[in-house]
Curated annotation (Swiss-Prot):
Lipid attachment, kind N-palmitoyl cysteine: C27
Subunit text: Monomer.
InterPro entries according to UniProt: LolA/LolB/LppX, OM_lipoprot_LolB
Bilayer-spanning residue ranges: none
Name the record gives this protein: Outer-membrane lipoprotein LolB
Gene Ontology, cellular component aspect: cell outer membrane
Gene designation: lolB
């Protein structure tokens, strides 16, 4: 009788594991390289990307400022107006997390210290000496311009952004992947303004 109970428990555990595997597989984000032969409809692509409000991007960021160079791994989550950017690795200050919305931003480090401010730029400049333009990043990381703000841009042979100038930033894009068979998203971004340059490599997208 006890053996029957063990077998039943094992079967139940296997069933649960199988259900979890199927669920995770169905939610997995697919990514394929965009070939030079693929040409996208610019208007359709823009509206699809504009409607994309929630994602996670993982990769590496390089920062060049005031004749200094740093790098870090990152995880960037966006959900509507809410965002979270986790930086960790060779940054030299341990791990940090910047999170917030349109009203306030907080920065927490691995020592448990937490600071708040009205905007990310002020907080990051005070603590890091450089900043990520989070207000624009939620558009620029998808390779689209901020709506209703003046900009100049150039397209590549795929009809996707290769260069964008907006809000004082010069942004260039190289390498795209088609995510979930619908969204052409960049994997390499270079952003510069004044004496600050950000080199963003996106290793994976989850949407």
């Amino acid at each position: 009788m006890s053996k029957l109970k063990i077998d039943t428990k094992r079967r139940f555990s296997l069933l649960i594991a199988l259900v979890l595997i199927i669920s995770l597989s169905s939610c997995a984000t697919t990514q394929t390289n965009v070939t030079t032969k693929t040409v996208f409809n610019q208007e359709t692509t823009y509206h699809n990307l504009l409607k994309l409000k929630k994602w996670q991007a993982n990769g590496v960021i390089g920062i060049i400022y005031d004749n200094q160079a740093e790098s870090a791994n990152y995880t960037y989550l966006q959900d509507g107006d809410n965002f979270s950017i986790k930086l960790y690795g060779p940054l030299g200050i341990g791990s940090i997390e910047i999170k917030g919305d349109t009203n306030s931003v907080s920065l927490a480090n691995s020592k448990g210290q937490k600071l708040t401010a009205k905007d990310a730029k002020t907080l990051m400049l005070e603590q890091l000496g450089w900043y990520v333009p989070v207000e624009g990043l939620k558009y620029w990381i998808k390779a689209i311009a901020i709506p209703n703000i003046r900009q100049t841009s150039e397209l590549n042979t795929n009809n996707l952004l290769s260069k964008l100038s907006q809000n004082g930033w010069s942004i260039s894009y190289s390498n795209y992947q088609l995510v979930d068979s619908k969204y052409p998203l960049p994997t390499k971004i270079r952003m510069s303004r004044d004496n600050l340059t950000l080199k963003i490599v996106i290793k994976s997208w989850q949407i």
